[in-house]
Amino acid sequence: MRVIFMGTPDFAVGTLEEIIKAGHEVVLVVSQPDKAVGRSKALKYTPVKECAVAHGIEVYQPAKIRAEESVEYLRQYNADIIIVEAFGQIIPKAILDMPRFGCVNVHASLLPKYLSLIHI
């Protein structure tokens, strides 16, 4: 299955690793842009990007996933499914409707009971 994975922090890495281990074809990883850290303001990869790079998977880091160029960029991958975990941006309907089997959001707690931005 052709998968686009969208995520950013450490706890999303486990999900990405399991998708890869299951033998699915991860055609693209979408993560938040790298951030400047420390006095040197060196750019730091997101944990999900680090994982993708380690597996040789292409990474896309849009400032705004809602931008038309982001929507068109994702469209070219013809994904069967998009799996999202802690991506950090609201995904537009144009992307949600794109994959053949839809989009699945993985949440670290029971919904709606534990719905919040800080759910762990």
Protein language model features and the residues they cover:
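One-carbon transfer enzymes
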Residues: M1-I118
